[in-house]
């Protein structure tokens, strides 16, 4: 009986010792968390900046850990399943089908057909032409808005050679004065969309209106030709033809829901149709080896359809699977892409970039892309299009704000993922309750609320990072070289 009484007398002491151990452990955690808050509140960053200001001018890293990288897509690999367009000079443009044949679209002042008719039915009965090439011409012709002057088109199929001629001149002075609403303007509009993505096309737009295209040439001639080294002004791209095709399909089925048309999901490296990582082989890239993008980036392509890079991934994926199943038969491949185009690309994106090109606004040519790579984890962002203006790619400084925003988005995604993982593993309620009760932690929280500044900004301009400005507003690298400009501290 005495032993039982002694045991119960010792219980409070045991509980007290346990509580002491718990309090010591929580105090250590509170001190460690307070030290962490001191390290991240900006004080260390401020001291580091004061020591390094005006010296470090690294341009390859953003937010300290994200490196800007680029890739260029080689769209010549798509030639077996979809027509590619490119340009040789101001007047000669080409459509590539397969490895040997194609179409030449020429702006000229010399007529090659004297008559004013086009006997398509007779040519079809005699099987005079290549049906793969003719389907491309049909897509072009059916895309011309309000084509109601059949004498403006002539064609000839002698010996299997395709020759189609559009008259761009005006028979009446009234038509010349009202060029914007004529068939000639419609032909030029469609031509610029077929040979899309080139401010190098010599068309004089003298009215300042994007839908009014004028030229000094009198004829547009389309002929079949052998495929040689024609692409001297631009690389081959399927976007022009696919843009025409999807726009014509949208005009026919105007009531379709946009999101309902996107049904193609990217397969993984094993060909499975589940969202996952996706790798671009060296055959798909220009002057680059294998590049892979993880689940996080590629899953966005399967969820959303508002990025040009996602459209190109779908085209490459479609091309790979179509070649395996169709054995690269040209006519069958073109028929398939005609039916599948609305499941692969966002025609609104193509139209938007085409209009931006005509209006002189930087646009996407679907060839070059930039993305951020985490130098430690290797995690990448979803590549975004590197915009083109006046025939050349923009300088990196023109979209530095977009790069900073992309880095912020990646940091936010990483923190959200880490938070969810931590919440699923560690019960933080008791620890946080005690931590918030310590004065050391309250001081660290106060420093966070104060928001100690860490670097200087030029008044009225964006963040200069990764450049470091001194009190005169200059950086020793030479980019910011005007001394005496007003600066202010920012966190």
UniProtKB/Swiss-Prot annotation:
Site positions (Cleavage): 58-59, 259-260
Positions of Zn(2+) 2 binding: 455, 457, 463
GO CC terms of this entry: host cell endoplasmic reticulum membrane; host cell Golgi membrane; host cell plasma membrane; membrane; viral envelope; virion membrane
Segments on the Extracellular face: 2-17, 59-432
Gene Ontology molecular function, alphabetical: metal ion binding
UniProt keyword annotation of S-adenosyl-L-methionine present: no
Keywords: Disulfide bond, Fusion of virus membrane with host endosomal membrane, Fusion of virus membrane with host membrane, Glycoprotein, Host cell membrane, Host endoplasmic reticulum, Host Golgi apparatus, Host membrane, Host-virus interaction, Lipoprotein, Membrane, Metal-binding, Myristate, Transmembrane, Transmembrane helix, Viral attachment to host cell, Viral envelope protein, Viral penetration into host cytoplasm, Virion, Virus endocytosis by host, Virus entry into host cell, Zinc
Biological processes annotated in GO: fusion of virus membrane with host endosome membrane; receptor-mediated endocytosis of virus by host cell; virion attachment to host cell
InterPro entries: Arena_glycoprot (IPR001535), Arena_glycoprot_zinc-bd (IPR043015)
Site, Important for GP-C-mediated membrane fusion: residue positions: 33
Residue positions bearing lipid (N-myristoyl glycine): 2
Glycosylation sites: 79, 89, 99, 109, 119, 167, 224, 365, 373, 390, 395
Positions of transmembrane segments: 18-33, 433-453
Domain of life: Viruses
Family: Belongs to the arenaviridae GPC protein family.
Protein name: Pre-glycoprotein polyprotein GP complex
């Amino acid at each position: 009986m005495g032993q039982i009484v002694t045991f119960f007398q010792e219980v409070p002491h045991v509980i007290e010792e346990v509580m002491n151990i718990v309090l010591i452990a929580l105090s250590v955690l509170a001190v460690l968390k307070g030290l962490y808050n001191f390290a991240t509140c900006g004080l260390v960053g401020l001291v580091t900046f004061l020591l390094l200001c005006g010296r470090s001018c690294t341009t390859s890293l953003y937010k300290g850990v994200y490196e800007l990288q680029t890739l260029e897509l080689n769209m010549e690999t798509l030639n077996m399943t979809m027509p590619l367009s490119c340009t040789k000079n101001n007047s000669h443009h080409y459509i590539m089908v397969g490895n040997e044949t194609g179409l030449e679209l020429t702006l000229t002042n010399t007529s090659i057909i004297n008559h004013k008719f086009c006997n398509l039915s007779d040519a079809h009965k005699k099987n005079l032409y290549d049906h793969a090439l003719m389907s491309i011409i049909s897509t072009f012709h059916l895309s011309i808005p309000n084509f109601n002057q059949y004498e403006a088109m002539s064609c000839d199929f002698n010996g299997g050679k395709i020759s189609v001629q559009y008259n761009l001149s005006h028979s009446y002075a009234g038509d010349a004065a009202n060029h914007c609403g004529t068939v000639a303007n419609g032909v030029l509009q469609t031509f610029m969309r077929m040979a899309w993505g080139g401010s190098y096309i010599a068309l004089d737009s003298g009215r300042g209106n994007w839908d009014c295209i004028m030229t000094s040439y009198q004829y547009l001639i389309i002929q079949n030709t052998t495929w040689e080294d024609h692409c001297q002004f631009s690389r081959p791209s399927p976007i022009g033809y696919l843009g025409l095709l999807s726009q014509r399909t949208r005009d026919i089925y105007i009531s379709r829901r946009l999101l309902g048309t996107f049904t193609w999901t990217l397969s993984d490296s094993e060909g499975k149709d589940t969202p996952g990582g996706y790798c671009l082989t060296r055959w798909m890239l220009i002057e680059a080896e294998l590049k892979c993008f993880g689940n996080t980036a590629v899953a966005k392509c399967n969820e959303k359809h508002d990025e040009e890079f996602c459209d190109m991934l779908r085209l490459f994926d479609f091309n790979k699977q179509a070649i395996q199943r169709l054995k690269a038969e040209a006519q069958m491949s073109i028929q398939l892409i005609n039916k599948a185009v609305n499941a692969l690309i966002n025609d609104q994106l193509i139209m938007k970039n085409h209009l931006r090109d005509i209006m002189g606004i930087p646009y996407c040519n679907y060839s070059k892309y930039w993305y951020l790579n985490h130098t430690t984890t290797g995690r990448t962002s979803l590549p975004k299009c590197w915009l083109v203006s006046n025939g050349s790619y923009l300088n990196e400084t023109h979209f530095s704000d977009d790069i900073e925003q992309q880095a912020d988005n990646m940091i936010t995604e990483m923190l959200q993922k880490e938070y969810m993982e931590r919440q699923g593993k560690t019960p933080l309620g008791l620890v946080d309750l005690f931590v918030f009760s310590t004065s050391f932690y309250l001081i660290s929280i106060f420093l966070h609320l104060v928001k100690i500044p860490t670097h200087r900004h030029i008044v009225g301009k964006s963040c200069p990072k990764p450049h470091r400005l001194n009190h005169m507003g200059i950086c020793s690298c030479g980019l910011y070289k005007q001394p005496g400009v007003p600066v202010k501290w920012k966190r």
